Amino acid sequence: MTGWPTEPDLRATHHATQALAQRLRLPFRSQTWRGQVGNWIGAGVGSSIDFQDHRPYLPGDDPRHIDWRAYGRTGHYIMKLYREEVTPLVDVALDLSDSMLFDDAKRTRTAELLYFSLESARQSDASLRLFAVRGPHWVPWELASILAYRPPVFADTATGAHEPPVLRNIPWRTGALRVFISDLLFAGSPEPLLQPLTGGKGRGLIFAPYCRAEASPDWAGDIEFVDCENGHRQIQHIESRLLRRYEDAYRRHHELWREHCQKRAVTLARVAAEQPLAATLQAEALPVGAVELWV
């Protein structure tokens, strides 16, 4: 893997996203959570101070939750029910295809989305796991390594590295918010990537960074193109008609992803690289529910 930001750049990115996560975060409040004990309202009953309802006492119930006032009125043991308090689960997978790193602004935005997701989870006391994906290969990315601004280490970066990312082998946790950061610039149906994001009661969310160079290029005349995935070079004469064909194909590709995400109930937010992160998240991610205001 080449082109990962330097340690000073990552340190600055991390510092900025720490501040941003105090105003915007991943959509925790809009979810109903199940999981280990924590600070978030869950789907079941538990022992928080948030009193919810009554039910008759059953053998094995905690007698500390008996409503003695109700017993005095009715002569029956009545249990107080409380909302369960749980810890949200957040699994983040970062696509490290070369197309994510070829452009300076896009590379920075990719790192910003990673550290924003990380800080959203940490500042919300969520249980966090991170993975790096490159073609069919994935590795767990230890939090300590990310906080030390070290890139992930793949045992094999050559075989299949230029293929679309494979998510089905990642050990996603049941009921987790599954965040996939990828530009989605690979051919084929979106379904093989979307199914792992929603299986096992998962909640899928995709941040798709993009840059002006790919979305609205200013090509004209003879242009030398370099495939950032395999290094292949080709000189192509670009005229306005060919440029429009490219722009139409690019637009249709992302419309296809949007349609499939809607069918799968996966939240998709495309995130422009040239604007400040806070501005583009508010403009593009907030309206679709990929982030929420934190006040």
Please describe what each predicted stretch is.
Residues 1-43, 56-64, 70, 75, ...:
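Exposed, interaction-prone extracellular/peripheral surfaces
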Residues 49-50:
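Charged, amphipathic alpha-helical linkers/stalks
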